[in-house]
Amino acid sequence: MADVEVETEVAAGAQPKKRTFRKYSYRGVDLDALLDMSTDDLVQLFPARARRRFQRGLKRKPMALIKKLRKAKKDAPAGEKPEPVRTHLRNMIIVPEMIGSIVGVYNGKTFNQVEIKPEMIGHYLAEFSISYKPVKHGRPGIGATHSSRFIPLK
């Protein structure tokens, strides 16, 4: 009896475990449904700030960005990443249609390339392109304290 159990465990252990990936869902709606959803239904899932933005309507510039992203995706060969699309529209809200695109988001100095992933839905492009250099707290500068008069200048 014990020998039979050992054999089944060995047989089960011989097969490699298949990796399972978590299916992405935004507020309980899976990605496939999000892509098929109309804009009005999608807006109902967004937080209040994003809902207000969409209710006021997408103006000319955001629509132009979406058209450029569509064109870049269409022109890309199958299985390849699309060409990056540069933009200054840091206040653009990421929608499911943009997933898989590469956007160059301007931070005031350079265009930071951002690949749009499903987890980014509902966020602003600016959140993924930092516009300042984070402070590195270190040694005090010249004139910071009275004792700094005795620090030799470099």
Swiss-Prot record:
Full protein name: Small ribosomal subunit protein uS19
GO biological process: ribosomal small subunit assembly; translation
GO cellular component term of the entry, any: cytosolic small ribosomal subunit
The keyword Zinc appears for this protein: no
GO molecular function, a single term: RNA binding
Cited PROSITE patterns: RIBOSOMAL_S19
Keywords linked to the UniProt accession: Ribonucleoprotein, Ribosomal protein
Origin species: Oryza sativa subsp. japonica (Rice)
Matching InterPro entries: Ribosomal_uS19, Ribosomal_uS19_CS, Ribosomal_uS19_euk/arc, Ribosomal_uS19_SF
NCBIfam families with a match to the protein in the record: PRK04038.1 (NF003121), uS19_arch (TIGR01025)
Lineage: Eukaryota, Viridiplantae, Streptophyta, Embryophyta, Tracheophyta
Disulfide bonds: none
Family, per entry: Belongs to the universal ribosomal protein uS19 family.
Highest rank taxon of the organism: Eukaryota
